[in-house]
């Protein structure tokens, strides 16, 4: 065993502890050790003070990333391009319930004390609108595809991704990066996704419609990130614990003013995360959920929910995993130019299932049943996992407050009570 000696290494970013390994003669900073530990499957934790957090945004921009994160816009917390801490929703939280969302002012300056809003990271994996190709009619009357020079894919850094959202990103990766659902565009999807730098934020409180604990997707993120922040507010101190999840995450930490996390700091962060798990607003019994829905395909509950459902598609638009799209061809009046666009669509629109002769699912009953059964049952057959991560967006942003957890519970309870599937 070589001797190790503690040093103080000064840099432009402040002083950090380092150790010298006499066996190999190298000086190891905590960030360098973290990079080596990630390679060996170990995780290191650091702390970063609130007033040093802007250094994180600066380091990401220096690496060529467009930084995306939470910001206030039109009375909601949404995702957009941010420059630093000044753009974060400092001092804001939210109140959520079925069909209800309201911002609340806090009595502190917490940066990440909100729950997930109407936006998800899906819009950067699967853009709401994407031009697939365009063509122009030549002098000979034939259409010629106009090929655009290859454009460098944007390098995104996602700041503020929650545990349920990391699972949603993984689910969409499985859908979009292979198989028939990729639509032959696996290469562009892979480029768009692989270079994303993810700074996760651990939930320290749960929203009124959250049920990620039931789905096993949160509230604590254990993987899928480069760095993970846990916000800790004390009477005289505001800081973050910083967990390293990748080699490039460890490399970025080296550019920040940081310190190894002490045991009491890690304990405070752990208590904050456990508080979120204890506050979960909803729960969903997923035992036998796939078979439960298959057994109750003709259950009267589908008709009952259809009487409330507006078939507006809000639930599918805010869902972080729904991937329905449609393709539309657009021409000019002279027929000289044509473009093909891919746009988000919803299985709640009557035209989505339209084939020759009419729509396959003409009733709201059949469309809601399709959505919920796909999300909780047939998705498992297709992709090997549930399509629901328990984020609760579909509950919050439903205009009439339809609750997927309540609908599943109603079917389960009626079956347990012995109510025949075809009777009210």
What function would you assign to each model-found segment?
Residues 38-294, 299-302, 322, 333:
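Iron-sulfur-associated redox domains of electron-transfer enzymes in respiratory
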Residues 286-307, 325-424:
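Ferredoxin-type iron-sulfur electron-transfer modules in oxidoreductases and energy-metabolism complexes
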Residues 6, 12, 164, 212, ...:
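Short cysteine clusters
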Residues 12-18, 30, 170, 218, ...:
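Secreted/processed peptides and extracellular or luminal domains of membrane proteins
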């Amino acid at each position: 065993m070589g001797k190790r000696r503690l040093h103080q290494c000064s840099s432009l970013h402040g002083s950090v502890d380092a150790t010298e390994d006499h066996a190999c003669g190298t000086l190891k900073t905590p960030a360098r050790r973290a990079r080596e530990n990630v390679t060996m499957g170990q995780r290191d934790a650091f702390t970063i003070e609130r007033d040093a957090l802007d250094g994180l945004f600066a380091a990401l921009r220096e690496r060529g990333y467009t930084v995306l994160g939470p910001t206030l816009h039109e009375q909601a917390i949404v995702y957009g391009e941010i420059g630093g801490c000044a753009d974060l929703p400092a001092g804001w939280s939210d109140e959520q319930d079925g069909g209800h969302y309201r911002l609340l002012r806090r009595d502190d300056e917490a940066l990440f004390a909100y729950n997930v809003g109407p936006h998800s990271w899906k819009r950067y994996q699967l853009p709401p609108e994407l031009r697939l190709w365009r063509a122009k009619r030549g002098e000979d009357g034939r259409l010629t595809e106009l090929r655009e020079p290859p454009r460098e894919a944007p390098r995104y850094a996602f700041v503020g991704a929650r545990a349920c959202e990391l699972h949603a990103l993984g689910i969409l990766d499985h859908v979009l990066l292979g198989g028939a659902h990729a639509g032959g565009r696996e290469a562009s999807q892979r480029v768009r996704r692989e270079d994303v730098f993810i700074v996760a934020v651990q939930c320290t409180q749960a929203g009124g419609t959250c049920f990620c604990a039931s789905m096993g997707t949160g509230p604590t993120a254990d993987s899928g990130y480069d760095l993970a922040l846990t916000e800790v507010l004390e009477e005289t101190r505001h800081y973050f614990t910083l967990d390293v999840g990748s080699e490039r995450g460890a490399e970025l930490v080296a550019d920040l003013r940081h310190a190894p996390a002490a045991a009491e700091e890690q304990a405070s962060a752990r208590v904050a995360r456990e508080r979120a798990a204890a506050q979960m607003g909803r729960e969903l019994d997923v035992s036998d959920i796939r078979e439960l829905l298959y057994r109750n395909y003709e259950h009267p509950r589908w008709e009952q929910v259809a009487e409330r459902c507006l078939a507006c598609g809000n639930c599918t638009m805010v869902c972080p995993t729904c991937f329905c799209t449609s393709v539309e061809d657009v021409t000019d009046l002279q027929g000289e130019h044509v473009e093909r666009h891919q746009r988000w669509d919803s299985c709640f629109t009557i035209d989505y299932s339209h084939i020759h002769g009419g729509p396959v699912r003409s009733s709201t009953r059949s469309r809601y049943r399709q959505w919920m059964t796909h999300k909780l049952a047939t998705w498992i057959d297709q992709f090997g996992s549930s399509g629901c991560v328990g984020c609760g967006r579909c509950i919050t942003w439903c205009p009439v407050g339809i609750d997927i957890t309540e609908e599943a519970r109603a079917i389960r309870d009626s079956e347990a009570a012995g109510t025949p599937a075809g009777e009210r």
